[in-house]
């Protein structure tokens, strides 16, 4: 029998979900294509799936498979060519003192409390603000690939030394990092934690000598997803080809909310 890491993508099966309400574009229905079985999707296979436009939620690996909509566009930053704009430089300057700790995916009560606070203030009524501990763990702490949790805290000597400000989940691929999900303290007015988190991940990707930071799906008509076009140069996947893309919103310099990767 072949070693697990040698199994080709042809060993996987793909099925389409039933239609469900789209969480990004109001009034639309969505479907996903899910890769199975989950136990065959190791780090190598998952890297190849991400390059084909897939993401994961817990142990479920999926990509958009909608009947009449193609709004969700896989995107990735070319980290070696990335240069921050003025607002991104300001976000870096404001938050570079945060202490980052990279750890395995582990349940921490403090993280869960921040997650609920973030959901209640940023996505109230969406259902995730009522997530149980089990739902939180299934969503963010279950993975069969090379995943990490990163927590950001106020540094020693600061007025709130040790205070948790942000938690981010990332996957390590063979050609880059993939941002899974980020949540942060929503009570700090004027903070740019989400922007800083992406900048931090870009730097980490560079330090690993890898070319890409995958940001999930860019959706032009979704305000909470359109921000991704601010990180240039951005590549998008169309058909089976990645190509450089500059979104109209980014080109016009329109402001966007601080990101939270989803």
Swiss-Prot record:
Main location: cytoplasm
Enzyme kind, highest EC tier: transferase
One Pfam family recorded for the sequence: ATE_C
Any GO molecular function: leucyl-tRNA--protein transferase activity
SUPFAM superfamilies, alphabetized: Acyl-CoA N-acyltransferases (Nat)
Catalysed reactions listed for this entry: N-terminal L-glutamyl-[protein] + L-leucyl-tRNA(Leu) = N-terminal L-leucyl-L-glutamyl-[protein] + tRNA(Leu) + H(+); N-terminal L-aspartyl-[protein] + L-leucyl-tRNA(Leu) = N-terminal L-leucyl-L-aspartyl-[protein] + tRNA(Leu) + H(+)
Record keyword 4Fe-4S present: no
UniProt keyword Membrane present: no
Protein location: Cytoplasm
EC number(s) reported in the record: 2.3.2.29
UniProt keywords, alphabetically: Acyltransferase, Cytoplasm, Transferase
One annotated GO biological process: ubiquitin-dependent protein catabolic process via the N-end rule pathway
Gene Ontology CC terms, in alphabetical order: cytoplasm
Highest taxon listed in the record's lineage: Bacteria
Residue stretches in coiled coil: none
Similarity section: Belongs to the R-transferase family. Bpt subfamily.
Known role: Functions in the N-end rule pathway of protein degradation where it conjugates Leu from its aminoacyl-tRNA to the N-termini of proteins containing an N-terminal aspartate or glutamate.
Annotated protein name in UniProt: Aspartate/glutamate leucyltransferase
Originating species: Cupriavidus metallidurans (strain ATCC 43123 / DSM 2839 / NBRC 102507 / CH34)
Primary gene name: bpt
């Amino acid at each position: 029998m072949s070693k697990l890491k040698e199994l080709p993508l042809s060993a996987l099966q793909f099925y389409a979900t039933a239609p469900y309400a789209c969480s990004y574009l109001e009034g639309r229905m969505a479907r996903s294509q899910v890769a199975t079985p989950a136990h065959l999707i190791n780090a190598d296979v998952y890297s190849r799936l991400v390059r084909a436009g897939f993401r994961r939620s817990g142990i479920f690996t999926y990509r958009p498979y909608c009947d009449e909509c193609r709004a969700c566009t896989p995107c990735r930053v070319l980290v070696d060519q990335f240069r921050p704009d003025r607002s991104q430089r300001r976000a870096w300057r404001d938050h570079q003192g945060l202490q980052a700790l990279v750890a395995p995916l582990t349940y921490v009560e403090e993280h869960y409390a921040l997650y609920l606070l973030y959901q209640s203030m940023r996505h109230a009524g969406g259902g995730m603000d009522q997530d149980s501990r089990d739902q939180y763990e299934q969503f963010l702490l279950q993975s069969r690939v090379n995943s990490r949790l990163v927590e950001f805290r106020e540094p020693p000597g600061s007025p709130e030394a040790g205070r948790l400000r942000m938690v981010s989940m990332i996957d390590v691929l063979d050609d880059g990092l993939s941002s899974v999900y980020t949540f942060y303290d929503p009570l700090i007015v004027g903070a740019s934690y989400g922007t800083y988190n992406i900048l931090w991940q870009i730097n980490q990707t560079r330090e690993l000598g890898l070319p890409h930071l995958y940001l999930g799906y860019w959706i032009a008509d979704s305000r909470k997803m359109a921000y991704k076009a601010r990180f240039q140069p951005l590549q998008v996947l169309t058909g089976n080809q990645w190509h450089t893309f500059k979104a109209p919103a980014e080109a016009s310099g329109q402001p966007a909310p601080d990101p939270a990767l989803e």
